[in-house]
């Protein structure tokens, strides 16, 4: 599309006023009755994933070749270590609590382990590889559309601070994650972790997509990522749905593509842009189910803990399109 006229800062501000009016219409539409019958039907898919989880784990570890090491072999085989790790992360309890729970579930797991053994799972390289393979298996099973939304959030390292209630949301008491969600399936397709910033986590999540060979057809991002630098991370074939800032002065070719898309179909642009709410809803559900606190002290173990949250999210993912 060629606009046929020069795009100025004034034009952008007027265009944003129009988008504000359309946004209110869309918010009213979103209040329509939720299709609970369809949601209940899709919950059966989740139950099937849970039933097949041991099978998925076996497939995930089948492609891992472990070289024999000097010293004592591990007392627990890889399949049981992966299942134990997933169980520990799902429970969202301290390692000592998990140790006590395993006394109850010993007939199920067939093992007795100490809280120290559980903690070491968070830095077990073989478990990490198995989880990565499991992540990919779940995506292959469900399919990847190429149409995504992305957002970041923070997790607290101390029980006295919460990311949502801390106005600065920075510093040594928080760690940042960025997850990219498939708007068709509700599954996470990319994950990034950082002890520095949300944008650093964002770039790592994009790197994960690239490493898996996942093509990004479209993506919606919030205003925090409304910059030319962000737009240049995507190629010309990717439709980026982000709202320009009101003080945008230098338009340039990168922003022109976004503005052309808005002018061509403002309602459709906003409907797609608001799909980013899926990311916020996903974070909220994850923190309710798996907690908002990171108990691990080592950086690699913190990253592993938060990757596992995304993995469990995909197991429980239910996407009902209205």
Curated annotation (Swiss-Prot):
Keyword annotations from UniProtKB, A to Z: DNA recombination, DNA-binding, Transposable element, Transposition
Name the residues that span the membrane. none
One GO BP:
transposition
Q: Care to name a GO molecular-function term for this sequence?
A: DNA binding
The record's family statement is: Belongs to the transposase 11 family.
What's its job?
A: Involved in the transposition of the insertion sequence ISA1214.
Name of the protein:
Probable transposase for insertion sequence element ISA1214
């Amino acid at each position: 599309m060629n606009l046929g006229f020069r795009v100025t800062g004034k034009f952008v501000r007027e265009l944003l006023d129009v988008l504000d009016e359309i946004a209110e219409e869309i918010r009213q539409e979103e209040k329509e009755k939720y299709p609970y019958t369809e949601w209940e039907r899709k919950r059966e898919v989740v139950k099937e994933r849970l039933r097949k989880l041991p099978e998925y784990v076996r497939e995930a570890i089948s492609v891992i070749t472990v070289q024999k090491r000097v010293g004592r072999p591990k007392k627990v085989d890889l399949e049981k270590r992966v299942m134990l790790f997933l169980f520990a992360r799902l429970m969202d309890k301290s390692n000592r609590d998990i140790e006590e729970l395993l006394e109850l579930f010993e007939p199920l797991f067939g093992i007795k382990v100490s809280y120290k053994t559980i903690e070491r799972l968070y830095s077990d390289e073989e478990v990490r590889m198995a989880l990565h393979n499991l992540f990919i298996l779940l995506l292959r099973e469900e399919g990847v559309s190429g149409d995504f939304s992305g957002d970041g959030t923070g997790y607290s390292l101390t029980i006295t601070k919460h990311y949502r209630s801390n106005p600065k949301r920075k510093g040594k008491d928080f760690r940042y994650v960025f997850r990219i969600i498939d708007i068709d399936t509700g599954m996470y397709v990319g994950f990034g972790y950082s002890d520095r910033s949300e944008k650093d986590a964002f770039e790592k999540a994009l790197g994960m997509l690239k490493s898996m060979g996942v093509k990004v057809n479209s993506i919606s991002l919030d205003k925090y990522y409304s910059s030319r630098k962000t737009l240049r991370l995507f190629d010309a074939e990717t439709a980026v749905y982000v709202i320009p800032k009101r003080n945008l002065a230098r338009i340039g070719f990168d922003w022109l593509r976004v503005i052309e898309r808005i002018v061509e179909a403002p309602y459709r642009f906003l409907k797609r842009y608001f799909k980013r709410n899926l990311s916020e809803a996903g974070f909220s559900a994850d923190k309710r189910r798996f907690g908002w606190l990171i108990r691990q002290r080592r950086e690699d173990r913190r990253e592993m803990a938060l990757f596992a949250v995304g993995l469990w999210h995909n197991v429980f993912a239910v996407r009902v399109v209205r």
